[in-house]
Amino acid sequence: MIKRIASIGILVLIIVIGFIQKDELLHIIKEGGTLSIFISMLLVAICVFFPIIPFTVLAGIIGAVFGITHGAIISLTGAMVGTMAFFFLSRYGFRDFAREKLLKYPKVREYESFFNRNSFVAIITSRLIPVIPAPVVNTICGLSKVRWLTFFSASAIGKIPNILLLSYVGSSFSSNKLYSVGLYGIYIVIVFLINFVIVYRRMSKTSS
């Protein structure tokens, strides 16, 4: 009970601070400098729990301020800090509460079995092609038998392409807005079509 209360308290505090101070934090990021690096990582980590700022916008801003390479490293670091915090909170903080809620959905058991059988490949795939929402992936993996190192490495690898693209789009936005928006738009369409095909195939198998 104490673990649950402490975990929920920490989570709520992080979200509240981020939500109240988001404008000030964004201003610091845009100024650049050492402090803005840590603030950028903090905001990205908070967005893993609660999207106070759309991640596409935040990663794009970070890319615009720090450039493609440094921006991608900063965004990836923040994303992994938040992702691992989510994972460990699910596993050790509010495990019973999370399991009780998720088990109300029969599909979750299928996902959990899938992650347990093919954890590394399954996690990478779920990051590259987000058929399953990221918070659900984090929670299921935290509740499952997936090792934290496997979860960390697979999640990091799976997040790299999207973060690199967002950093590139952000860095080139000021010089060519149409190109940047169009490039990410094409990426979104491709991901959507892949998701559509996967869902359609699953529905076809279920109905047959």
Regions found by a protein language model. Name each.
Residues 34-74, 113-172:
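Hydrophobic alpha-helical membrane segments of integral membrane proteins
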Residues 1-40, 80-136, 143-146, 175-179, ...:
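Membrane-interfacial helix-loop-helix
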